[in-house]
Curated annotation (Swiss-Prot):
Region: Regulatory domain, residue numbers: 392-522
Organism expressing this protein natively: Shewanella oneidensis (strain ATCC 700550 / JCM 31522 / CIP 106686 / LMG 19005 / NCIMB 14063 / MR-1)
GO biological process terms, semicolon-separated: L-leucine biosynthetic process
Subcellular localization(s) per the UniProt record: Cytoplasm
Pfam families tied to this protein: HCS_D2 (PF22617), HMGL-like (PF00682), LeuA_dimer (PF08502)
Domain Pyruvate carboxyltransferase residues, every copy: 5-267
Entry keyword set: Amino-acid biosynthesis, Branched-chain amino acid biosynthesis, Cytoplasm, Leucine biosynthesis, Manganese, Metal-binding, Transferase
Name listed for the protein in its UniProt record: 2-isopropylmalate synthase
Top-level taxon of the source organism: Bacteria
Family: Belongs to the alpha-IPM synthase/homocitrate synthase family. LeuA type 1 subfamily.
GO cellular component: cytosol
Cofactor: Mn(2+)
Amino-acid biosynthesis keyword on record: yes
Lineage: Bacteria, Pseudomonadati, Pseudomonadota, Gammaproteobacteria, Alteromonadales
Length: 522
């Protein structure tokens, strides 16, 4: 048996079912092209009979994708299969995926038929789909709760009818790894023609076991895993593609399997799916979460600086990230501060490490994570000046025209002790406030990230706005808190303006430092 595991991505079919708003055809095509670069073997891109929009998107993707096999879903009905075949007919290579429920509860309660009738429908659907392509996949929906005798009969009949791939879904995420592995093993032991098809698995994450069940299934003979990027999908989601790919790559010494996934595309593809689907990735998500390669513990950071594999079982570069992050927090030791200063190009003669570390701990206790620009300000600006705010928001008044969508904001800002008042318009109240603040401070920055959240609960809750902005090719992170979202946004921007002001002071200091070095060397 081959050790190659086929990666069947269903982000654009099962994954999209979890979205509050449907993706456009253009957005689906963007994701499909990213999945092709990622190296998925098969991509299931829609359910053509469900709507004209889904039909169009399947057809568009089928016409464009060349290196992955494009697949469409259909129920065990001729009209569904006709729609799938028509939408896919423009593809260079395609698969029709047809399915029917096989568990007792589904057969009796949903389909209201006997198992024998369902078996006949399944065989008929596979034979009908074979008229359009020899690549037909058949799924036994809710296989995890199907009586094993019935499941064996269904699999044998579907293979005999012409199905090349048989999918065994844990549709409701009910099974545990030992149980699911036993189901797969029993199929291999009892289905006489099982060697004529690829056994696939499609596991949901209702109990958090989708990845574990999929890996166990492969160990018992399955050779296709159905999954989605970031694990998105119905209810608690699907098996995560990125987790499967990196488990099989990282533990190849133990498991002995390989895939065709280009792991260096994982990070980029994950971000694209997150952005287009408007589904943020939890920070502690395995492989692709913001904290996946971030180290905050001083002990861990010390180990990482000595040897990366002390606390990393895979490298961030392997999934397309530049490098790990050593978060500077109150738990970080002197060695991390010294390392960051060296990374920024400073020698130990440029600053006093002991004094810097003491100031760093004071700031870290107040704000949590400390960034590079904070460290530079502490090192080269007087301690109090490094924390003083040159800009302070004193008043914000916003007026909005609900019909035109144009808003006007007036701000009173204290600039180095002097009050300045400016007004500006914008596309909405937040944009207007930003424009007015930019005028008052005479600073221009590019905002590249805006996140709205809440701090506290009930009546005590405050709106929290986190922004990331670019100034002179450096990223700055600002936070604003207020009962009003517009005010919180304005305070976040003023926070960034103060950070850039300190950065300018640091730049002046560095320039003078370099001049003094040159003069000293003459």
């Amino acid at each position: 048996m081959s050790n190659r595991v086929i990666i069947f991505d269903t982000t654009l079919r099962d994954g999209e079912q979890a979205l509050a708003a449907s993706l456009s055809v253009k957005e689906k095509l963007q994701i499909a092209m990213a999945l092709e670069r990622l190296g998925v073997d098969v991509m299931e891109v829609g359910f053509p009979v469900s709507s004209p929009g889904d039909f169009e998107s399947v057809q568009t993707i089928a016409r464009t994708i060349k290196n992955s096999r494009v697949c469409a879903l259909s129920r065990a009905l001729e009209k569904d299969i006709d729609a799938a075949a028509q939408a896919l007919s423009v593809a260079e290579q395609f698969r029709i995926h047809t399915f029917i429920s096989t568990s007792t509860i589904h057969v009796e309660s949903k389909l209201k038929r006997s198992f024998e009738q369902v078996l006949e429908m399944a065989v008929g659907a596979v034979k009908y789909a074979r008229r359009f392509t020899d690549d037909v996949e058949f799924s036994c929906e809710d296989a995890g709760r199907t009586p094993i005798d019935n499941l064996c009969r269904m699999v044998e009949a579907a293979i005999h009818a012409g199905a090349r791939t048989i999918n065994i879904p844990d549709t409701v995420g009910y099974t545990v790894p030992s149980e699911f592995g036993s189901i797969i093993q029993t199929l291999f032991n009892r289905v006489p023609n099982i060697d004529q098809a690829i056994i696939s698995v499609h596991c949901h994450d209702d109990l958090g076991l989708s990845v574990a069940n999929s890996i166990t299934a492969v160990q018992h003979g399955a050779r296709q895993i159905e999954c989605t990027m970031n694990g998105i999908g119905e209810r608690a989601g699907n098996c995560s593609l990125e987790e499967i790919a990196m488990i099989l790559a990282t533990r190849k010494n133990l498991l002995g399997f390989e895939t065709g996934i280009n792991a260096k595309e994982i990070h980029r593809t994950s971000n694209l799916v997150s952005q287009l689907c408007n589904m943020p990735i939890q920070s502690n998500k395995a492989i692709v979460g913001a904290n996946a390669f971030t180290h905050s513990s001083g002990i861990h950071q010390d180990g990482m600086l000595k040897a990366q594999n002390t606390y990393e079982i895979m490298t961030p570069e392997s999934i397309g990230l530049n490098r790990n992050n050593l978060n500077m927090t109150s738990r970080s030791g002197r060695h991390v501060i010294k390392h960051r200063m060296e990374e920024m190009g400073y020698s130990s003669q440029d600053y006093n490490l002991d004094a810097l570390y003491e100031q760093f701990l004071h700031l870290a206790d107040k704000k949590g994570q400390v960034f590079d620009y904070d460290l530079e300000a502490l090192a080269f600006i007087e301690a109090q000046a490094a924390e003083d705010n040159f800009y302070q928001l004193r008043q914000l008044v916003v007026q909005s025209d609900s019909t035109e969508g144009v808003a006007t904001a007036t701000v009173r800002i204290e600039v180095g002790g002097e009050i300045k008042t400016e007004a500006a318009t914008g596309n909405g109240p937040v944009d207007a406030a930003y424009n007015a603040i930019a005028r008052a401070t005479d600073r221009r920055i590019d905002i590249i990230s805006y996140k709205l959240g809440a701090k506290g609960v009930g009546q005590d809750a405050l709106g929290q706005v986190d922004i990331t902005a670019v100034y002179h090719e450096q990223n700055f992170h600002g936070v604003g808190l207020a009962t009003d979202v517009v005010e919180a946004s304005a305070r976040a921007l003023v926070h960034v303006m103060n950070l850039t002001c300190r950065a300018d002071k640091v730049a002046d200091y560095k320039q003078n430092m370099h001049k003094n070095r040159e003069l000293g060397g003459v």
